[in-house]
Amino acid sequence: MSGTTHHHATFPAVEAAAFTRRHLDDLAAGLLGTVRVPGFFGRPALDTMLTSLHRVPVVSFDLDRMHHPMARFGTALNDYRTPELALDADRYWHDADTARRQWAGIGMTPDPLELALDALGRAWGVRPAPATIGGRPAFVGMLREVNDGTFIHYDDINREYRGGLFDQKIVAQLAFNAWLAAPREGGTTTVWRHRWEPADENRRHGYGFQPTAVADDPYVTVAPAAGDALLFNANNYHVVHPGAPGQRRIALACFLGVTAGGELVVWS
Protein backbone atom coordinates (compact mmCIF):
# COMPACT_ATOMS: atom_id res chain seq x y z
CA MET A 1 0.00 0.00 0.00
CA SER A 2 1.65 3.24 -1.09
CA GLY A 3 1.71 6.36 1.05
CA THR A 4 3.87 9.24 2.17
CA THR A 5 4.50 10.86 5.54
CA HIS A 6 6.65 13.94 6.01
CA HIS A 7 8.19 14.92 9.30
CA HIS A 8 8.65 18.66 8.88
CA ALA A 9 7.11 21.48 6.85
CA THR A 10 10.56 22.59 5.65
CA PHE A 11 11.11 19.23 3.93
CA PRO A 12 7.80 18.55 2.16
CA ALA A 13 6.71 15.45 0.30
CA VAL A 14 4.75 16.13 -2.89
CA GLU A 15 2.38 13.79 -4.70
CA ALA A 16 1.52 14.74 -8.28
CA ALA A 17 -0.06 13.37 -11.43
CA ALA A 18 3.19 13.97 -13.35
CA PHE A 19 6.68 15.33 -12.76
CA THR A 20 7.17 18.99 -13.70
CA ARG A 21 10.11 21.32 -14.28
CA ARG A 22 9.26 23.02 -10.99
CA HIS A 23 9.59 19.69 -9.18
CA LEU A 24 13.02 19.07 -10.67
CA ASP A 25 14.20 22.60 -9.93
CA ASP A 26 12.94 22.50 -6.34
CA LEU A 27 14.50 19.10 -5.67
CA ALA A 28 17.81 20.31 -7.08
CA ALA A 29 17.63 23.41 -4.87
CA GLY A 30 16.82 21.39 -1.75
CA LEU A 31 13.33 22.85 -1.35
CA LEU A 32 11.48 19.51 -1.50
CA GLY A 33 12.00 16.16 0.17
CA THR A 34 10.43 13.87 -2.41
CA VAL A 35 8.07 13.91 -5.38
CA ARG A 36 5.99 10.78 -5.97
CA VAL A 37 3.83 10.07 -9.02
CA PRO A 38 1.31 7.28 -8.36
CA GLY A 39 0.54 5.16 -11.39
CA PHE A 40 3.56 6.43 -13.32
CA PHE A 41 3.37 3.15 -15.21
CA GLY A 42 -0.28 2.47 -16.02
CA ARG A 43 -1.66 -0.91 -14.99
CA PRO A 44 -1.95 -2.36 -18.52
CA ALA A 45 1.64 -1.31 -19.35
CA LEU A 46 2.91 -2.63 -16.02
CA ASP A 47 1.20 -5.99 -16.50
CA THR A 48 2.80 -6.33 -19.93
CA MET A 49 6.25 -5.42 -18.58
CA LEU A 50 5.97 -8.02 -15.85
CA THR A 51 5.41 -10.81 -18.38
CA SER A 52 8.95 -10.13 -19.68
CA LEU A 53 10.65 -9.80 -16.31
CA HIS A 54 11.65 -13.46 -16.12
CA ARG A 55 13.82 -12.98 -19.23
CA VAL A 56 15.95 -10.27 -17.62
CA PRO A 57 19.41 -11.63 -16.64
CA VAL A 58 20.58 -10.35 -13.27
CA VAL A 59 23.80 -10.34 -11.28
CA SER A 60 24.48 -9.57 -7.64
CA PHE A 61 25.94 -6.31 -6.41
CA ASP A 62 29.40 -6.60 -4.89
CA LEU A 63 28.59 -8.00 -1.43
CA ASP A 64 31.94 -6.87 -0.03
CA ARG A 65 30.84 -3.31 -0.76
CA MET A 66 27.07 -3.44 -0.27
CA HIS A 67 26.76 -5.94 2.64
CA HIS A 68 23.08 -6.58 1.79
CA PRO A 69 22.15 -9.03 -0.99
CA MET A 70 20.85 -7.10 -4.01
CA ALA A 71 20.35 -8.10 -7.62
CA ARG A 72 20.64 -5.88 -10.66
CA PHE A 73 20.36 -5.88 -14.42
CA GLY A 74 22.73 -3.44 -16.08
CA THR A 75 25.73 -1.59 -14.75
CA ALA A 76 25.92 0.44 -11.55
CA LEU A 77 28.86 2.83 -11.77
CA ASN A 78 29.86 2.31 -8.14
CA ASP A 79 30.60 -1.35 -8.85
CA TYR A 80 33.31 -0.23 -11.30
CA ARG A 81 35.15 2.25 -9.08
CA THR A 82 38.78 1.53 -8.27
CA PRO A 83 40.39 2.23 -4.87
CA GLU A 84 41.89 5.33 -6.51
CA LEU A 85 38.34 6.66 -7.22
CA ALA A 86 38.75 6.08 -10.95
CA LEU A 87 36.66 4.03 -13.39
CA ASP A 88 37.66 0.47 -14.25
CA ALA A 89 36.94 1.43 -17.84
CA ASP A 90 37.59 -1.84 -19.69
CA ARG A 91 35.29 -3.81 -17.43
CA TYR A 92 32.62 -1.10 -17.32
CA TRP A 93 32.32 -0.59 -21.07
CA HIS A 94 32.31 -4.32 -21.73
CA ASP A 95 29.47 -4.86 -19.26
CA ALA A 96 27.55 -1.75 -20.36
CA ASP A 97 27.64 -2.80 -24.02
CA THR A 98 26.59 -6.33 -23.05
CA ALA A 99 23.65 -5.01 -21.02
CA ARG A 100 22.47 -2.84 -23.92
CA ARG A 101 22.48 -5.84 -26.25
CA GLN A 102 20.68 -7.98 -23.69
CA TRP A 103 18.01 -5.32 -23.12
CA ALA A 104 17.36 -5.00 -26.85
CA GLY A 105 16.99 -8.78 -27.04
CA ILE A 106 14.47 -8.96 -24.19
CA GLY A 107 12.02 -6.80 -26.11
CA MET A 108 10.09 -5.57 -23.07
CA THR A 109 7.08 -3.69 -24.45
CA PRO A 110 6.38 -1.03 -23.51
CA ASP A 111 9.95 -0.23 -22.55
CA PRO A 112 9.95 1.20 -18.99
CA LEU A 113 13.14 3.17 -19.64
CA GLU A 114 11.69 4.84 -22.72
CA LEU A 115 8.49 5.69 -20.85
CA ALA A 116 10.53 7.18 -18.01
CA LEU A 117 12.80 9.26 -20.25
CA ASP A 118 9.81 10.54 -22.20
CA ALA A 119 8.07 11.62 -18.99
CA LEU A 120 11.21 13.28 -17.62
CA GLY A 121 11.68 15.01 -20.96
CA ARG A 122 8.17 16.43 -20.78
CA ALA A 123 8.98 17.73 -17.30
CA TRP A 124 12.33 19.30 -18.22
CA GLY A 125 11.36 20.48 -21.69
CA VAL A 126 14.04 18.39 -23.43
CA ARG A 127 14.45 14.62 -23.22
CA PRO A 128 17.50 13.90 -21.04
CA ALA A 129 20.52 12.38 -22.75
CA PRO A 130 23.01 9.99 -21.15
CA ALA A 131 25.96 11.57 -19.38
CA THR A 132 29.17 10.93 -21.29
CA ILE A 133 32.60 9.68 -20.25
CA GLY A 134 35.27 10.62 -22.76
CA GLY A 135 32.52 11.13 -25.31
CA ARG A 136 30.89 7.72 -24.72
CA PRO A 137 27.35 7.56 -23.30
CA ALA A 138 27.04 6.03 -19.83
CA PHE A 139 24.68 3.12 -19.34
CA VAL A 140 21.13 4.08 -18.35
CA GLY A 141 18.33 1.77 -17.26
CA MET A 142 19.36 -0.45 -14.38
CA LEU A 143 16.72 -2.73 -12.89
CA ARG A 144 17.44 -3.26 -9.21
CA GLU A 145 15.94 -5.69 -6.71
CA VAL A 146 16.42 -4.58 -3.10
CA ASN A 147 14.44 -6.79 -0.73
CA ASP A 148 16.58 -6.68 2.42
CA GLY A 149 17.19 -2.94 2.67
CA THR A 150 20.31 -0.79 2.57
CA PHE A 151 22.46 1.24 4.94
CA ILE A 152 21.81 4.95 5.34
CA HIS A 153 23.87 6.59 2.59
CA TYR A 154 24.01 9.33 -0.01
CA ASP A 155 25.02 9.40 -3.68
CA ASP A 156 27.27 12.06 -5.17
CA ILE A 157 29.14 11.39 -8.41
CA ASN A 158 31.49 14.29 -7.67
CA ARG A 159 32.68 12.63 -4.44
CA GLU A 160 32.56 9.03 -5.63
CA TYR A 161 34.86 9.64 -8.60
CA ARG A 162 37.81 11.97 -8.47
CA GLY A 163 37.04 14.84 -10.82
CA GLY A 164 33.39 13.83 -11.18
CA LEU A 165 33.93 11.26 -14.00
CA PHE A 166 31.59 12.79 -16.61
CA ASP A 167 32.37 15.20 -19.41
CA GLN A 168 29.53 17.31 -18.01
CA LYS A 169 29.88 19.16 -14.69
CA ILE A 170 27.10 17.92 -12.40
CA VAL A 171 25.80 20.58 -10.01
CA ALA A 172 22.77 18.66 -8.68
CA GLN A 173 22.06 14.93 -8.61
CA LEU A 174 18.57 13.45 -8.31
CA ALA A 175 17.61 9.81 -7.80
CA PHE A 176 14.78 8.30 -9.86
CA ASN A 177 13.00 5.05 -9.05
CA ALA A 178 9.95 3.54 -10.73
CA TRP A 179 8.70 0.31 -9.16
CA LEU A 180 7.74 -2.69 -11.24
CA ALA A 181 7.09 -4.77 -8.12
CA ALA A 182 6.69 -3.76 -4.49
CA PRO A 183 6.09 -5.55 -1.18
CA ARG A 184 2.72 -5.22 0.52
CA GLU A 185 4.53 -4.29 3.73
CA GLY A 186 7.89 -2.62 4.31
CA GLY A 187 10.34 -1.69 1.58
CA THR A 188 9.88 1.99 2.37
CA THR A 189 12.36 4.71 1.42
CA THR A 190 13.31 7.37 3.96
CA VAL A 191 15.06 10.57 2.88
CA TRP A 192 16.53 13.00 5.42
CA ARG A 193 17.25 16.69 5.03
CA HIS A 194 20.89 16.00 5.74
CA ARG A 195 23.98 16.32 3.54
CA TRP A 196 27.42 14.96 4.26
CA GLU A 197 29.48 16.86 6.82
CA PRO A 198 32.93 15.99 8.21
CA ALA A 199 31.60 14.92 11.62
CA ASP A 200 29.66 12.14 9.89
CA GLU A 201 32.89 10.25 9.30
CA ASN A 202 32.79 9.37 13.01
CA ARG A 203 29.45 7.65 12.41
CA ARG A 204 30.47 5.40 9.52
CA HIS A 205 28.75 2.04 9.09
CA GLY A 206 30.05 0.02 6.14
CA TYR A 207 29.49 2.05 2.98
CA GLY A 208 27.00 4.22 4.86
CA PHE A 209 26.30 5.79 8.22
CA GLN A 210 24.82 5.00 11.60
CA PRO A 211 21.28 6.22 12.40
CA THR A 212 22.73 8.72 14.88
CA ALA A 213 24.00 10.75 11.91
CA VAL A 214 20.43 11.75 11.04
CA ALA A 215 18.66 11.35 14.38
CA ASP A 216 17.62 15.01 14.65
CA ASP A 217 16.96 15.76 10.98
CA PRO A 218 13.61 16.22 9.18
CA TYR A 219 12.71 13.28 6.99
CA VAL A 220 10.24 11.87 4.49
CA THR A 221 9.20 8.22 4.32
CA VAL A 222 7.61 6.85 1.15
CA ALA A 223 6.01 3.41 0.82
CA PRO A 224 6.42 1.88 -2.65
CA ALA A 225 3.66 0.60 -4.88
CA ALA A 226 4.01 -1.16 -8.22
CA GLY A 227 3.77 1.43 -10.99
CA ASP A 228 4.64 4.44 -8.81
CA ALA A 229 7.71 6.62 -9.41
CA LEU A 230 9.79 8.65 -6.97
CA LEU A 231 12.30 11.49 -7.30
CA PHE A 232 14.52 12.92 -4.55
CA ASN A 233 17.86 14.66 -4.23
CA ALA A 234 20.47 11.89 -4.08
CA ASN A 235 22.86 14.07 -2.03
CA ASN A 236 20.44 13.81 0.90
CA TYR A 237 20.99 10.84 3.17
CA HIS A 238 18.51 8.06 2.41
CA VAL A 239 17.80 4.42 3.15
CA VAL A 240 15.65 1.57 1.89
CA HIS A 241 14.03 -0.42 4.69
CA PRO A 242 13.60 -4.20 4.39
CA GLY A 243 10.41 -5.49 2.84
CA ALA A 244 8.22 -8.28 4.15
CA PRO A 245 9.85 -11.70 3.78
CA GLY A 246 9.27 -13.37 0.44
CA GLN A 247 8.03 -10.20 -1.28
CA ARG A 248 9.96 -8.57 -4.12
CA ARG A 249 10.89 -4.91 -4.55
CA ILE A 250 12.06 -4.26 -8.13
CA ALA A 251 12.62 -0.80 -9.58
CA LEU A 252 13.93 0.90 -12.68
CA ALA A 253 16.66 3.11 -11.23
CA CYS A 254 18.81 5.91 -12.58
CA PHE A 255 20.27 9.26 -11.61
CA LEU A 256 19.47 12.63 -13.14
CA GLY A 257 22.16 15.27 -13.23
CA VAL A 258 21.59 18.97 -13.68
CA THR A 259 24.71 20.29 -15.40
CA ALA A 260 26.52 23.60 -15.07
CA GLY A 261 25.22 24.38 -18.56
CA GLY A 262 21.60 23.87 -17.52
CA GLU A 263 21.13 20.50 -19.23
CA LEU A 264 19.62 17.33 -17.77
CA VAL A 265 21.64 14.12 -18.16
CA VAL A 266 21.02 10.57 -16.93
CA TRP A 267 23.05 7.54 -15.87
CA SER A 268 22.75 4.40 -13.76
Swiss-Prot record:
Which gene specifies this protein's sequence? Answer: besE
Q: What happens when the gene is disrupted?
A: Cells lacking this gene still produce L-propargylglycine but not L-beta-ethynylserine, that are terminal alkyne-containing amino acids produced by wild-type S.cattleya.
Q: In which pathway does it act?
A: Amino-acid metabolism; Antibiotic biosynthesis
Key word Oxidoreductase present in the record? yes
Cofactor(s) needed by this chain: Fe(2+)
Q: Which organism is it from?
A: Streptantibioticus cattleyicolor (strain ATCC 35852 / DSM 46488 / JCM 4925 / NBRC 14057 / NRRL 8057) (Streptomyces cattleya)
- InterPro entries, per this entry? WelO5-like
Please list the reactions this protein catalyses.
Answer: L-gamma-glutamyl-L-propargylglycine + 2-oxoglutarate + O2 = L-gamma-glutamyl-(3R)-L-beta-ethynylserine + succinate + CO2
* Protein name (Swiss-Prot/TrEMBL): L-gamma-glutamyl-L-propargylglycine hydroxylase
MF terms (GO), sorted A to Z: L-gamma-glutamyl-L-propargylglycine hydroxylase activity
* First-tier enzyme category under EC: oxidoreductase
Highest rank taxon of the organism: Bacteria
Q: What does this protein do?
A: Involved in the biosynthesis of terminal alkyne-containing amino acids such as L-beta-ethynylserine, that are produced as antibiotics by S.cattleya. Catalyzes the hydroxylation of the dipeptide L-gamma-glutamyl-L-propargylglycine, leading to L-gamma-glutamyl-L-beta-ethynylserine. Cannot use L-propargylglycine as substrate.
Enzyme Commission number, as recorded: 1.14.11.-
Q: Name one GO biological process term.
A: L-beta-ethynylserine biosynthetic process
Keywords on this record? Amino-acid biosynthesis, Antibiotic biosynthesis, Dioxygenase, Iron, Oxidoreductase, Plasmid
